[in-house]
Amino acid sequence: MAKARNINRPLSPHLQVWKWGPHMLVSILHRVTGSGMATVGVGVFLWWLGALASGPESYAKFLDCLTVESGAPNIIGYVLGIGLTLSFFQHMMTGIRHFFLDAGAGYELKGNKTFAVLTMVVSVALTAALWGWMIYGELAKAPKTETPIAVEKK
């Protein structure tokens, strides 16, 4: 059986000098958030759709898993909601970053690192702004609408 690497051959120089950077983290986060949104987001959507189609009792159980009596999210609802929102904004901001990279801009090392860090900061800021608006802003003051299926909580 052959060895994995011939020690008599030189190692490519670029493999000896690389350092971990924010641009690498953003690239990995882009893949993770895309997969996470596809898996978790579609799973929750299909769960909601199945509960909606199965009738009032199934829909009430779905709501009980994600909300409290007032209709506000419970801890599971907040974790899923904030997690999916952060994933969405991170994926979107990284997509915008890739758009500029595809156009040939932002390949200078300092600019690339700055744009990578900015991508993460802006995605967290957008998530915080959206959830702040939903919890404390105009959306919180909006009148509550009825659910698609009349659900009586027992």
Please give the residue ranges for each predicted region.
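Membrane-embedded alpha-helical bundles that constitute the cytochrome b-like, heme-associated redox core
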Residues: 1-154
